[in-house]
Amino acid sequence: MYTQGNPKLWTGRLDSETDPKQFRHFQTVKFANLENMENVSDKTGVGLLGYAVDKGVENNKGRIGSRKGPDIIKHEFAKLPDLSECEMLIDYGNVEHTSNHLRETQQEMARLSAKVIKQHKQAFLIGGGHDIAYAQYLATREVYSDASIGIINIDAHFDTRPDEPPTSGTMFREILDNDENVDYLVLGLAQGGNTRALYDYAKDNNIIYVYADELLHQVSPTIKDKIERFIHDHDTIMFTICMDVIDSAFAPGVSSPSVLGLYPHSVFEISKRVILSDKVSSISIAETNPDYDVDNRTSKLAANLIHHFLV
């Protein structure tokens, strides 16, 4: 079910009502109904769409609560200063899970996400469970029907399980098994978070991956080159971040916390190498779970990711 944006989430410190240089995002955001949107010829500004769904996490036997993530992240983002001089920032609201099957909700999210991608220079899709990535893929394929898609996932897990029904850990296998024009790069993989069967699947399907311990301090030129070559080799890039890749000292509020995860600055550095490419069609941030957060630490981190990614 689609619900429009909630203006009550968008509050913060008011430094000035007249000087744009003192504005924060809550002073510049606008709201719109995706169901009434008409196609545009030129992409402009930034669109936000939430995926207030944790059914996939529940199916994956994870800690539920990430359905609350989009609203909390938007609220934290609203407080941050407007430094990008973004020409347009629109909150389109959320998609919620009210149907009998997760797939139906993913398809609804995909339909609406495609509209955001077509409308904006930057489309931010905010989870919710990481099964948002399947909706993100469907939307990307709708917009770029014949393109080669490169999926870049900063994540502790492959998320290529063969389980049924679909979960927050199956979506990339579903994509790779059904679309030969997609490749997959995982950055931040936890050695203790993936079985041998998943490594075998990765080998059989040419999945490129980098372990978390290769990214702990400074991103090496070799890894930077790997990311840049992957981007170069594809027509469009679908970028997704699972917040559980970040060490639980910094991101405790996730569905599956990491004890040997990445530092936030490593995620920022890696992400900047991706975001700078005009091939990036959409960005999703998944698995923030406010029920397990401490001082809104994880939601603030997710909000700051969006803030730093604005171009």
Curated annotation (Swiss-Prot):
It comes from the Bacteria. Pathway: Amino-acid degradation; L-histidine degradation into L-glutamate; L-glutamate from N-formimidoyl-L-glutamate (hydrolase route): step 1/1. Mn(2+) 2 binds at D155, H157, C242, D244. GO terms for molecular function: agmatinase activity; formimidoylglutamase activity; manganese ion binding. It catalyses: N-formimidoyl-L-glutamate + H2O = formamide + L-glutamate. InterPro entries: HutG (IPR005923), Ureohydrolase (IPR006035), Ureohydrolase_dom_sf (IPR023696). It is an enzyme of class 3 (hydrolase). Its EC number is 3.5.3.8. HAMAP family: Formimidoylglutam (MF_00737). Catalyzes the conversion of N-formimidoyl-L-glutamate to L-glutamate and formamide. This is Formimidoylglutamase. It comes from Staphylococcus haemolyticus (strain JCSC1435).
